[in-house]
Amino acid sequence: MKIAIGNDHTAVDLKNTISDYLKELGYEVINLGTDSRESCDYPIYGEKVGRAVADGEADLGIAICGTGVGISLAANKVKGIRACVCSEPYTAKLSRMHNNSNVLAFGARVVGSELAKMITEAWLDAKFEGGRHERRVNMIMEIENQ
């Protein structure tokens, strides 16, 4: 499975930590983030991750900025993307099981590396349940088509 990962300047170290962790778990990682700590604009990287997932270049995406909010907003502007901001594993798990999220976002200023690993693992291990949740996800996706 291929995972696109993108980040702004606040999240270089956490991106590297999560990338290494993903590789240890056997995932292929596509680095779409910056490796510079000079100030940059998170929407660029949120869009890159979103497009990689929407276009099928990656199966899933991870987006990291200071809080996770801005980069997730940018990713969510890409049609077909369901990005979620998670700061603990339970929400990450349910975002996959109930909302079929395809981009995980978190904040480098909010979660440390160990918690970020736990969030990532919970998200990746969870599977979409379908059923009533599929109907609701389809309703969300219909909003994009209006």
Regions found by a protein language model. Name each.
Residues 4-6, 10-11, 89-146:
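C-terminal binding/interaction regions
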Residues 20, 47, 51, 73, ...:
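Alpha-helical segments flanking ligand/cofactor-binding loops in enzyme cores
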Residues 28-39:
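A short beta-strand-loop structural module common to alpha/beta enzyme folds
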Residues 45, 49-84:
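Helix-adjacent hinge/juxtasegments
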